């Protein structure tokens, strides 16, 4: 894995250059003059002062796939796999902290909820390397365990909780339910409490919602059990947004199709 960490550092250095170049380009842009001309930003008229308050984030997806390639097992499948995952994310955080010290700008580490890149990166890698890990059509978000892992709520939160504190640019974990868990609020409260204990800083609950476009019946179904219509609006959460499944990107459609519930309530 030494070669991997060397390549990881070189890639992080490239990201630093790209992020700084983007910030400097923005500072020189005249397209934002309207902010100052219309007194929408009152504290300064200097673009350098304005942009330095922002964050330059190193983001990552596909930690579990990385572990699978390096160790032939997934992130949640052994203590050694989890430890390697933590080591990788700690290295990324170290790079972000170093860049902040070197430049004086707000570099941070972001656990990316990839949308377009989730599928695009996997497709590009599969064309180049033909590795089965990228052949499924998407990469798993940030440090999440694979969506088809079927592990329990508690194991998922325990595994992912190790990473939240390292990602100072933002992070989120999800729990996947087979159906809407509205009849068991106590179970949701237990999940939230356990997430807090494990260091999870932001938690979301996922569950499918199907709505019949003909009669309005709601639930989870392929064909409406009330009117037998197959004209169904399917709402799912992806990358933090509730959207109609028809409008998902290719990679996210692959991800949703692979999802398995972490609990049945």
Segments from the language model and where they lie:
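Long, C-terminal-biased catalytic regions of enzyme "large/alpha" subunits
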Residues: 1-265
């Amino acid at each position: 894995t030494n070669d991997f960490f060397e390549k990881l550092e070189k890639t992080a250095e490239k990201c630093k250059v790209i992020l700084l170049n983007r910030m400097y380009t923005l500072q020189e842009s005249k397209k934002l003059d309207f902010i100052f001309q219309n007194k929408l930003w009152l504290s300064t008229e200097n673009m350098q002062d304005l942009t330095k308050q922002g964050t330059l984030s190193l983001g990552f997806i596909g930690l579990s796939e990385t572990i699978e390639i390096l160790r032939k097992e997934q992130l949640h499948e052994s203590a050694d796999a989890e430890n390697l995952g933590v080591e990788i994310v700690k290295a990324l955080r170290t790079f972000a902290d170093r860049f902040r010290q070197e430049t004086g700008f707000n570099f941070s580490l972001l656990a990316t909820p990839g949308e377009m890149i989730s599928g695009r990166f996997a497709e590009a890698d599969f064309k180049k390397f033909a590795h089965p890990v990228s052949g499924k059509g998407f990469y798993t978000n940030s440090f999440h365990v694979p969506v088809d892992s079927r592990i329990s709520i508690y194991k998922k939160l325990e595994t992912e909780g190790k990473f939240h504190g390292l990602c100072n640019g933002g992070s989120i974990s999800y729990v996947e339910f087979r159906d809407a868990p509205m009849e068991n609020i106590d179970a949701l409260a237990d999940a939230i409490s356990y997430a807090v204990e494990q260091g999870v800083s932001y938690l979301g609950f996922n569950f499918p919602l199907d709505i019949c476009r003909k009669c309005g019946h709601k639930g989870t179904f392929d064909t409406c059990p009330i009117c037998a219509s197959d004209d169904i609006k399917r709402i799912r959460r992806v990358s933090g947004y509730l959207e109609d499944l028809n409008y998902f990107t290719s990679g996210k459609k692959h991800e949703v199709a692979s999802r398995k519930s972490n609990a049945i309530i």
